[in-house]
Amino acid sequence: MQIVQKTNGRSMKRVLLSSALLLVSTLTFAQSKVSGTVKDANGDPLIGVSVMEVGTNNGAVTDINGNYTLNVKPGAKLKLSYIGFTPQTVKAGSNSQIVLQEDNTALNEVVVVGYGTMRRKDVTSSITTVKAEDLNQGVFTDPGQMLQGKVPGLVVSSTADPNGSPTITLRGASTLRTGAMSPYYVVDGIPGVDISIVSPEDIESIDVLRDATATAIYGSKAANGVIIITTKKGSKERTNVTYNGYVAIDNILKKYDVCTADDLRQYAKDNNITLKDGGANTDWQDEVLRTGISHNHNVNISGGNGSTNYMVSADLRKREGVIKMTGFDRFNVRSLVSTKTLKDHLTISIGANMMYGKHFGVPSGNEGASVLDAMNYYSPTNAVKNADGTWTVGSGSKNYNPLALMEENKSETVWKRNQFVGKTALELWKGLVWNVNYSWSNYQSTYSAYNTRNSQLEGIGNKNGQATRNTYFGREQTFETYLNYNFTAGKNKFDLMAGYSWEEKKNNDGFGLSVEGYYNDDLGWYNMSYAQTILGVQNSVQSGYLEKVRNISFYGRVNYSFDSRYMLQATIRRDGSSVFGKNNRWGTFPSVSAAWNITEEKFMQNQHIFDNLKLRAGYGISGNTMGFDVYSSYNTYGASGTFVYDGKTYRTYGATKNANPDLKWESTGMLNIGLDFAFLKGRLNGTVEVYHKKTKDLIWSYPVSTTQYIYGWMDANVGEMTNKGIEFTLNAVPVRAKNFMWSTTLNLSHNKNTVDKMQNETFHTTNLTQGDPMVAGVSADGWTQRIMEGEPIGTFYTYQYAGTVNGRSEYYVLDENGNRTGETTNNPSLKDRSITGCAQPKLNAGWNNTLTYKNWSLNAFITGVFGNDIYNSPRAHYTAAQMFSDGKNVLKEFLSNPVGDASSSLPSDRYIEKGSYVRLQTLSLSYTFRNCFNDWIQDLTLYGTANNLFTITSYKGLDPEVNMGGIDPGIDYRWSRYPHTRTFMVGVKINFGGSKKK
């Protein structure tokens, strides 16, 4: 028995040993070695092709000869991927010679144009498309901020003010009217939409139409360029729920280096000066500033079936400003349902959008009544409050305690906006589609402000509380119908479009009221009936004047392509508007452009350098009606003052505008020439563009004789302006390895602006002075810029600083030709001014880099501005001798200035500084978990983003990114410029895949 058991034990060991050897042998032979060569259609080897075993992380990369070797399991499949080529999946070992075909996705991608779409390959105009994943990341409230640095020629001056909007200029200023330089926005085919109704998280892509051949189809609204926003749509395959949320903190980038209380005391002691000393040592910047906390939550639900799809999104965002008591809350809802019927010949879409926002602000007026100003000038020797709990008060006038400004003068603005959209597209027969779009929207804004009985504002503190509320309404309607017809005849391809548009806007319907005399401050602006007095007739009741504007348009476009080699496009739009004079209600805006796909020619078929080479050229005319109301060309009358009769105050009325029946829109003609190129199988591609933009009939208000006209000024079309420049874009994939890729994009732009004409035989003005920063010690002629014929907007025209002589700032004396006489003076005259700088940059740059390794992604985005000047008015103001003598704080730089230098702050090149800078605008790191959870979560992405990490600049102010819009660019205004911030945010994006439709 025991022998049997022993024998069985030995047998078992042999069996186990044999099994182990068999298993090892099996595993060894299960990994078979496969090899092959990857080439392109021309037989050239492809280097760096990713060869991956499907369903595993096992892979290899082709060598310099296109060869690869890989150990794979039996029956495995290989996926081959290479930039610029269509991915291909093959059975391992089935073919040692693999040919990858070029991927024409980039050329065949759809580009959104006015009233339609086109293949990128067929585009003859200048259009830049930015996908959602390529937009700037950060705590943004405006889609314009997401484009900063992404589009050549598009200059975006951002702001950290949670209640502010960026200024946007495309290819230079085209008007002299402030507020009329912004591009025209189109959202999902609906023109003129207020983009506050669009949540940044809902954006699918943004197309920027940059030249007149692309924008002319929008006629009189398109001189400043057109930005087309496409939002996300529903899905037909499955119900998708996506959540995207983040939390962020903001801190100020830099503080002014103002004096401490001890600095002021030491300065007064050293110079035997009496100091108005409150006995404290307060850091007012610390008292006013805070770390702003923001959060955003966006939920997007989409789904559908074969004929119907839907999308609903809700977006809740809250942002605190770095100035205490500033911020906003906003809630957006967006919905869209689309369905196809009549055997898919009819598509009907219905959408509804809503926005509710509440903005909180603090005083930001000039003349010292601004928290942004007071936190720098209010003396650090003053305490926050007196011993009895009341606010400390600065000596003299316009010397406000910044915390008192905030706490005792509160305001908020509530915005409500609704939009309803209906769209139909009926295919009448193959290639012919009839589109009908209708949009209706309304808005309401309500402003509320309350000044308590403790307010330090002049004329307010003795009112026992003053409340102001006003509310205004507006409604807009847009109806458009157009036909698209495309067909092919042999090698000839046609795409025709013709349409009609009708718009109506009713704005400014509202009123306001101010009251005073409350029993206490508990109610604020609520229950205004409790106040004792309605303010006097001069400023008590505010009333809007209802205006109705109508625009009617007819438009058309022809696109022709022969054999994908030669393309021609012609557009025309005829616009009529009620805002202009009766003699010029209608205008025509044509354009024509052509393109030559050189690489499609037979003589290019055997070359191996260019993958794409296309030459484009075009000329078009577009207009500018922004900033006009229904009364722009009419005589108008309004309240012009008051008079007292029999002890009562009455209004007086007088003329406020002259009629001009010849007033018409400004028109901009633009010539654009572009070259598109691609090398190395698409790994290197880009565009070079040159343009010449001429704007005529610039509108300005000119002085006229009151013996001939009822009012002393008249709006007229007189001026001319030119912008010309060059733009360059380069996209590249320098590294593409097994699990790693580096992609980069560089864009550069240069624009030269010139004011060509400002007067004619009827209307005269030699120059226009602009940009008065209201600096202490400058009682008159504080302006710093002049608009002149032959010079660009933003030309600084100041005195030339000569240094300090005997404790006084001296300036060069100029002769009648503007040359220095060799003499200096501390009391210069206007003739001693000259051109001393220019705010226009010579170069704008944006450089984006994305590195991906497996599921990791790192993005770094750098922006730069070069060759511009900035007028540092805060430095001029906070170093003025008058500031110290008035008991206000100053910069530490002041301590080294001569005592009592009364002329130090005059507008001069002493305060004009180089504004060039390079900034790491965005650094973002993310990790995506894919298919790591159950069927209900497709992927989850964790990300962290930092904005404005560092800036390289020689500018001495807070930040070199000053406002570059308007007609006074490049001036650093102290009282209205919200400080820029450094932002850190962390977020998560979860895609709940849901279940597929059966």
Language-model regions: role of each:
Residues F328-K340, R585-A595, L940-F950:
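Short secondary-structure subsegments characteristic of cysteine-rich extracellular domains
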Residues S235-N281, V322-K324, N332-Q419, N435-I552, ...:
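Surface-exposed loop/interface segments of Gram-negative outer-membrane beta-barrel transport/assembly proteins
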Residues K842-G867, Y911-N931:
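C-terminal substrate/ligand-recognition segments
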